[in-house]
């Protein structure tokens, strides 16, 4: 196993471990939010703790997804052009989602 493959494997394992409590937290939070009024939801979603967890979850989740998809493309896509286009599509998707979430957090913070 090369050095970069080992680093990728280690990051995949640690990010998946980090996502377990984050996903659990957000599943519980969604159930709690479903029973709240609109004003209570806005209050909860505006808390710094919640916004930080949203950013952490988004960043770790997107990096984990990106690495996983890169591994799948590396293993199953053999055409050079298709591989480059797939990598570009993944990177654009990740950048777009991260941009939307970051902008949402900023707008919630300044509100």
PLM region spans:
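Membrane-embedded alpha-helical bundles that constitute the cytochrome b-like, heme-associated redox core
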Residues: 1-111
